[in-house]
Design a protein with these regions (language model features):
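Alpha-helical scaffolds flanking conserved acidic
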Residues: 58-71, 115-124, 141-147
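Alpha-helix boundary/interfacial micro-motifs
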Residues: 66, 90-91, 123, 163, ...
Length: 267
């Protein structure tokens, strides 16, 4: 994939990188609802990364680096949608493919002329969608891996509140709320565990898994953003739960998550 470079400066320059990104998007159908959702999401993650960098009191270079990582974190999604018209993980590992585009095809140089930060950027993007973040030991790399994971989840709160359910769930609110929650999903969520993608079966399993994202947030500052925006209650109450056991579980989960978000101590 060739992108005409508009970068001339040897530093982290977000505005120039954004111009390259906009040019990259010209290869895809912006009118496609799923593509547009991911474009909006990308810039939402940039905004959340910027806010986290501010709250974490990062220096200028790390703040700029966080924004660049956010801009590029889902670059593999667009090719996934072009080929498969799907976000499902069984169609493509979008994080790995994003790394392939950037670092195997050399596209990263179009966004960041210097290779100084390649190791940080590559690891953060490669690991941003891992079920659990493990094996990253270098302090600065770990910082940015945590920031992008949290920023991604924080913007996904906006997605779950405002985007068309048919676009990312394939069903309307009534149908989602009428389905059961699998026992393993119910148990894991109420025990404070993240949900493994492969364990999800029903529509409600998927919905619960999005709420269980909160358990995986790394920073107290991220949980503060969740609490300030009342994301737990607002996301839960977007769906009318008509299946009796589902309704009961969601009431329990709401109480547990509200308490967790308020009390949890993080890095």
């Amino acid at each position: 994939m060739k992108i005409d470079s508009v970068l001339k400066m040897s530093k982290i320059d977000y505005n120039a990188a954004r111009a390259v990104f906009e040019n990259y998007l010209n290869s895809y159908d912006r009118k496609n609802d799923k593509v547009w959702l991911k474009i909006v999401h990308t810039y939402g993650v940039v905004a959340e990364s910027t806010e986290l960098a501010k709250r974490l009191r990062l220096g200028e270079e790390d703040a700029s680096l966080a924004r660049i990582i956010a801009l590029l974190h889902d670059i593999g999604r667009f090719e996934q949608l072009k080929r498969y018209d799907s976000f499902m993980p069984d169609t493509m590992d979008h994080a790995s493919f994003g790394v392939h585009i950037l670092f195997r095809e050399g596209v990263i140089r179009q966004f960041v002329p210097e290779d100084t930060w390649d190791g940080i950027i590559e690891t953060a993007i490669a690991r941003h969608s891992d079920f659990v973040l493990e094996g990253v030991t270098e302090e600065r790399v770990l910082l940015h891996a945590r920031i992008i994971r949290d920023a991604d989840k924080l913007d996904n709160c906006r997605v779950k509140l405002t985007d068309d359910l048919m676009t990312f769930m394939g069903a309307d609110a009534g149908k989602i709320g009428s389905t059961a929650i699998s026992e393993k999903i119910r148990k894991d969520a109420l025990e404070g565990k993240s949900i493994l993608s492969a364990d999800r079966v029903t529509l409600m399993d998927y919905w619960v898994s999005y709420l269980a994202y909160f358990y995986d947030l790394n920073f107290r500052e991220s949980l503060d953003i969740v609490e300030e925006n009342d994301y737990v209650r607002r996301i839960i109450h977007r769906i009318p739960y008509t299946e009796p056991n589902t309704k009961k579980t969601m009431e329990e989960l709401e109480k547990r998550l509200v308490r967790y978000v308020h009390e949890a101590k993080k890095v």
